[in-house]
Amino acid sequence: MNKIIIGTRGSVLALWQAEYVKAELERAHEGLSVELKIVKTKGDKILDVPLAKVGGKGLFTKELEEMMLQGEIDLAVHSLKDVPVELIEGLTLSAITEREDVRDCFLSDKYASLETLPLGAKVGTTSLRRSMQIKSMRSDLDTESLRGNVQTRIKRLKEGDFDAIILATAGVNRLDLWKEVNYVIPIDTEMMIPAMGQAALGIECKEGSEAFRLTQILEDKKARIETTAEREFVRVLEGGCQVPIGANAYLEGETLHLKVAVGLPDGSEILMDRLSAPKGEAVRLGRELAARLIAKGARELLRRAEEMAFQ
C-alpha cells in the first residue's frame, strides 16, 4: 500500500490532528502518500441545538465509520472523547496517541478563574459534564450551550455573549490559543474531572487492514492503558459521549488510578469516587468503579440527566 486516505472532520482542530497523523505516517513509512478527505458529520451539521438534545451516539464519528466500511477512506482520526465505547463491527481503534494535557481550560477576558466570576455570570460550554461540575461548585452560575468550532466560541466570548467559556486545554495547546484572551487557565482535574479519552487521538480503521499495520507507530501504551479504564467505566455505566460523566485515569509507576464523577447537569446531585489497581488491570478497574457507582444509584442519575437534557 503506497497511498492511504485519512477521513477527518473539517474544523481547524480536526485538521490539525489529521495533519499530525499524516506527517507521522509519512515520516515513518518511506514512499507512503497520505491524502486527507474532509467529511461533515451529523454533529458538524446541527449547530443550533445542544449536543445532548441532538441525541444518539457517534455524532462526530458515524459518517466517517460508514465511509471506512465502504472503502472510501482507509482510516479516521478522531478526538478519542468523541468515539463511542462500542465500535461498529469490523472496525477497531488501531492506535491511541500520546495524550496532550488532559485538563479542561477556563477562558475569559475579564475574570481570572471560576471562583472570581460574579454572581449569575454566564459560562459557555458544549458539555453537560462541564456544566455539572461548574454548577456543583457555583450553583449561581448560568451555564449555556456553546456550539461551533474553537474560533467561533472564542469570538463569541470576545463579543461579550459569555463571561467565560470552557475548552479542552489540549485544543488550546494544539492551536496555540494562549494569547487569544486575557485569562487562559487550565483547571486542575481535582476540581473538574475530564471526559473519557480527553486529550488523546483515536485512530480507527478496519480490523486486519493494511492501515491497521501502518498506524501501529502512533500507539502510546500509557494512553491505551489509561483510556481503556476510562472507556470501560463509561461502557459498564451505559453512558454515551453526551451525558454528564467524568472519567480520568492516570498512571503512576506500576499503579493505575481512576477518578470519576456522574450526576445531573444542574450540579444538584453528583456522585464521585476513585479507585486504584495494578496497571495491567485497566478493564477490571473501570468495571469495579462502575459497579460501585451503580450500587450508589448512578444509572438512575444518568436516566434523570438525559430527561433534563431533553427538556
UniProtKB/Swiss-Prot annotation:
Keyword entries, A-Z: Porphyrin biosynthesis, Transferase
Quick check: keyword Transferase in the entry?
Answer: yes
Q: Which CDD domains match?
A: PBP2_EcHMBS_like
One of its Pfam families is Porphobil_deamC
Which Gene3D superfamilies has this protein been placed in?
Periplasmic binding protein-like II, Porphobilinogen deaminase, C-terminal domain
Molecular-function annotations in GO: hydroxymethylbilane synthase activity
Tell me, what is an example of a GO biological process annotation in this record? protoporphyrinogen IX biosynthetic process
Q: Which cofactor does it need?
A: dipyrromethane
Entry-annotated residues carrying S-(dipyrrolylmethanemethyl)cysteine: C241
GO CC annotation, single: cytoplasm
Substrates-to-products reaction catalysed: 4 porphobilinogen + H2O = hydroxymethylbilane + 4 NH4(+)
| Any further remark recorded for this protein | The porphobilinogen subunits are added to the dipyrromethane group.
Could you give the subunit structure recorded for this chain? Monomer.
The UniProt entry's sequence similarity note says: Belongs to the HMBS family.
List, alphabetically, the PANTHER family matched: PORPHOBILINOGEN DEAMINASE (PTHR11557:SF0)
Known function: Tetrapolymerization of the monopyrrole PBG into the hydroxymethylbilane pre-uroporphyrinogen in several discrete steps.
Record-given protein name: Porphobilinogen deaminase
Q: Which organism is it from?
A: Wolinella succinogenes (strain ATCC 29543 / DSM 1740 / CCUG 13145 / JCM 31913 / LMG 7466 / NCTC 11488 / FDC 602W)
